């Protein structure tokens, strides 16, 4: 369970590390420095953690090793972390669903992908203050297209969000404050 501490809850977002098999020491230095400075209660890796179809060629062990190294700074500090996917993650030759299962093997990972809606890693994280639900994080898959690289949030994901939001409001008698994380911004017209 994630909780406020002294009326605060710090989230550190890490995006676009875009690493391959050999993780740059500069990337790890940056992550470690940010964790030490911010002292977050949660880290959100918000897409394109890894990339490189020619680099990984679907090799699960190599992919798991790189993801483990990228999240090890959180694991070593016992800081909960979660993810959403970007447009390059699946280009490593392993589906986002398979990668999500890898993340679930790591210490300190939080999140469970919702079923029966488009995408992977659509999930909600509840943040409490004592027993009271204070805040929600909606993590939403913005998909990718292997041909052009980008896609967007699908209609049934928006409907999922609305249903979840409304069910929380009905259960708690108020709209629960929230933030969303996704890789690609929502389309607007």
Locations of regions flagged by a protein language model:
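Active-site environment of divalent metal-dependent phosphoester hydrolases
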Residues: 20-22, 51-54, 83-95, 145-148, ...
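Active-site-proximal segments of metal-dependent phosphoesterases and phosphodiesterases across multiple
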Residues: 63, 172-189
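Extended active-site neighborhood of metal-dependent phosphoesterases/phosphodiesterases
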Residues: 3, 64-174
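N-terminal active-site segment of His-dependent metallophosphoesterases
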Residues: 1-69
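Active-site neighborhood of phospho(di)ester-bond hydrolases with catalytic His/Asp-centered motifs
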Residues: 12-15, 43-48, 81-87, 177-180
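Active-site-proximal beta-strand elements of phosphoester/diester hydrolases
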Residues: 8-18, 134-144, 178-180
């Amino acid at each position: 369970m994630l909780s406020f501490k002294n009326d605060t809850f710090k989230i550190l977002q890490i995006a676009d590390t875009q690493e391959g098999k050999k993780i740059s020491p500069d990337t790890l230095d940056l992550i470690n420095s940010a964790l030490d400075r911010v002292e977050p209660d949660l880290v959100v890796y918000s897409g394109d953690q890894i990339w490189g179809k020619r680099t990984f060629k679907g090799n699960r062990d190599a992919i798991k090793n790189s993801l483990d190294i990228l999240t090890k700074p959180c694991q070593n500090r016992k800081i909960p972390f979660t993810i959403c996917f970007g447009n390059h993650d699946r280009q490593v030759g392993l589906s986002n669903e398979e990668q999500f299962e890898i993340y679930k093997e790591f210490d300190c990972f939080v999140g469970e992908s919702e079923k029966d809606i488009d995408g992977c890693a659509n999930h909600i994280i509840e943040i409490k203050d004592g027993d009271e639900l204070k805040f929600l994080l909606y993590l939403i898959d913005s998909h990718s297209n292997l041909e052009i690289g980008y896609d967007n949030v699908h209609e049934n994901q928006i409907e999922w969000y609305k249903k979840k939001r409304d069910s929380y409001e009905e259960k708690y008698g108020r709209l629960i404050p929230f933030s969303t994380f996704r890789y690609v911004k929502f389309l607007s017209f």
